[in-house]
Amino acid sequence: MHDKTWSGRFNEPVSELVKQYTASIGFDRRLAEWDIQGSLAHAQMLKETGVLDEGDLADIRRGMAEILEEIRSGKIEWSSDLEDVHMNIERRLTDKIGDAGKRLHTGRSRNDQVATDIRLWLRDQITVIQSLIQSLQTALLDLAEQNAETVMPGFTHLQVAQPVSFGHHMLAYVEMLGRDNERMADCRRRVNRMPLGAAALAGTTYPIRREITAELLGFEQICQNSLDAVSDRDFAVEFTAAASLIMVHLSRLSEELILWMSPRFGFIDIADRFCTGSSIMPQKKNPDVPELVRGKSGRVIGHLIGLITLMKSQPLAYNKDNQEDKEPLFDTADTLIDTLRIYADMMRGVTVKPDNMRAAVMQGFATATDLADYLVKKGMPFRDAHEVVAQAVRHADEAGVDLSELPLEVLQGFSDLIADDVYGVLTPEGSLNARNHLGGSAPEQVRFQVKRWREMSA
């Protein structure tokens, strides 16, 4: 007699090599607690529809409680001979309670069972991720509030462009994370649909009531097509895509932190606990955490491509290919959760160096656009103002000074519209304060946005 639940069809046992190759217990046992949740809800529904009696349900609940304790204490022995988490738990349950354990799988297939387990697990991961996104946003909001007036260069093409504040810069990432949170919430709506009851692919002949199971498991909707229910992994791809975008955003911030911490910039310092040294160079303080975040973003993006590729050629309904969805999905969630958790802590350990930031602003003619706007407001067409200021910048560059350091008579040599009030717009602070509109970089607007985000998060 074979040891497989499906072995009656076969004339010889599966080879050891095939067992090792096809077994998923090494990674899908992670779904054990969610598998038990689904089984308990399924058992309750079977009892309410008359498939199981009260005694069977009581035995199943007792047995599952014991198995759950074994799992949490690390005492359960997982067997690759039983292939996966579902059969391991079912065999353990049957060993404990006998025939009632064998009845549990009535009206159910591993196809809809695993699809349910993954959705239950992923739903919980998304809840954790959304909380961690908000925690990181809070850390960034604290930095933004503290640095609403801390002038730094805004860049395009990594060249000094216009003055902004460090607070305004941090708020850009708060906005990105806000969209990330929205995407996760939207993804969760599609994750939160129950496939259980689809059985192998066509449904079941038993008088099941899927709405009972859905309510017990907290699913907001029920998958309406049994073929789609067992073969759908859109939700996994969608989650991994949303996770990839978060990692891309954090990778962009990491790149900036790495640059800003370098002596060539010197805009910030990162607390020692997030950095490492060199085995040969005593002076080194390396920003390993943001570097690793930058690297791990590629890992998560790779999982997205892997899942899309996994699904692209599968006919309906379930195929063994889908066993390969779990490891990239698990690793995506783990990587994202770990990254968000450490990132919030790291941002609380960032020290800003305002003097270095302001000095960088003064080296790049960052207020040139402000001078052009000044001339336009005095009646000069913008294209003419652009040309006049370009000539002034070239002169200042050759003289080795900032526009604000040019004498008035020199500036007036470029246009007689220039008066001594020009110096109010040529300072970085004047440039910031002039942009006092919704979404602008003025300190007043930064404080408004910080307040708005705090109120939305409350």
Swiss-Prot record:
* Annotated compartments: Cytoplasm
- What is the protein's name according to its record? Argininosuccinate lyase
Q: Which reaction does it catalyse?
A: 2-(N(omega)-L-arginino)succinate = fumarate + L-arginine
Q: In which pathway does it act?
A: Amino-acid biosynthesis; L-arginine biosynthesis; L-arginine from L-ornithine and carbamoyl phosphate: step 3/3
User: In the Enzyme Commission scheme, what number(s) does this protein have?
Assistant: 4.3.2.1
One GO-annotated biological process of the protein: L-arginine biosynthetic process
Which UniProt keywords are given for this protein, alphabetically ordered?
Amino-acid biosynthesis, Arginine biosynthesis, Cytoplasm, Lyase
Q: Known HAMAP family for this protein?
A: Arg_succ_lyase
The keyword Lyase is annotated on this UniProt entry: yes
> Entry's PROSITE patterns?
FUMARATE_LYASES
- Enzyme class, top EC level, equals lyase
Q: Does the keyword Amino-acid biosynthesis apply?
A: yes
Listed GO MF terms: argininosuccinate lyase activity
The protein's matches in InterPro entries, at most eight in alphabetical order, are given as: Arg_succ_lyase_C, Argininosuccinate_lyase, Fumarase/histidase_N, Fumarate_lyase_CS, Fumarate_lyase_fam, Fumarate_lyase_N, L-Aspartase-like
> Can you tell me which family this protein belongs to?
Belongs to the lyase 1 family. Argininosuccinate lyase subfamily.
State one Pfam family annotation: ASL_C2
Q: Which PANTHER family match?
A: ARGININOSUCCINATE LYASE (PTHR43814:SF1)
- GO CC terms, sorted: cytosol
Primary site of residence = cytoplasm
